[in-house]
């Protein structure tokens, strides 16, 4: 049975004073450690700081402050959620990705640090052609909270992007995140991956579900019990969504355009073969910080006689933008071009 933490978890002898902020942090960390959580001190610091509205430095400075009973009860309630293996990001309702503070909820996957490898690989491909300042067209398949798309748009000042998802609730979260980070060049579309998109696109990115169906039950409780299963389950061998991408994306890419996908452990060779079979040209996968092959880049062949570089037609030409301009993104759009749809 999962250990419970109530207000009494912070209780001291009746003759003693109430707990200080620092003592409460230590009490939480001890409980988290006893429960086998991976980062007990960090989780305790974040949860106490979140409730008190204090950043790391301010929390340390407030260590001697006494908690009143109401504060102790509220912090204990947060601790109980974490002991039930609810991820800290879900308790807070937000997660930082690419230095962006993004809202997450039950409809969205919590973005992982290793997914930033996809952003890095996409930007490296764009930089190799000197195209970062161009009016690129980007699609993010299965956008969830919008992490990949919004990270790219913050780095590409003239790019336009569209994120797709089958969950309208997730699209609303992504739309709100776009508003929050000022990404007015984002659009969101209800679509099963690329099914409802109209091309051409210069860059397409995706972090598809890639866990084999039979392996989902063995995932950590923080993932298995709180991330949407539709964002995890990649079919019997974990490759169903890569097959769907291979079947649709080549027709949506401009000649010379790039596809970048996240990989599960051990999937690089199989996914590269799927993409090669439809005429894309894969590059060696990019490793994440743990050395695991995590991002795979595959390009659509350039037209015969096309010179190297996006400027020669592989990417959208430089365009003047205005607040009145729109971009045709297909059907069922939630928001488009320079204006995020109404709340």
Cite the ranges covered by each PLM segment.
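Non-catalytic accessory regions of SAM-dependent methyltransferases
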Residues: 1-59, 64-67
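Residue-level signal for inorganic ion chemistry
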Residues: 47, 85, 115, 148, ...
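Conserved SAM/SAH cofactor-binding pocket of Class I
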Residues: 114-218
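Mobile active-site "lid"/loop adjacent to the S-adenosyl-L-methionine
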Residues: 210-240
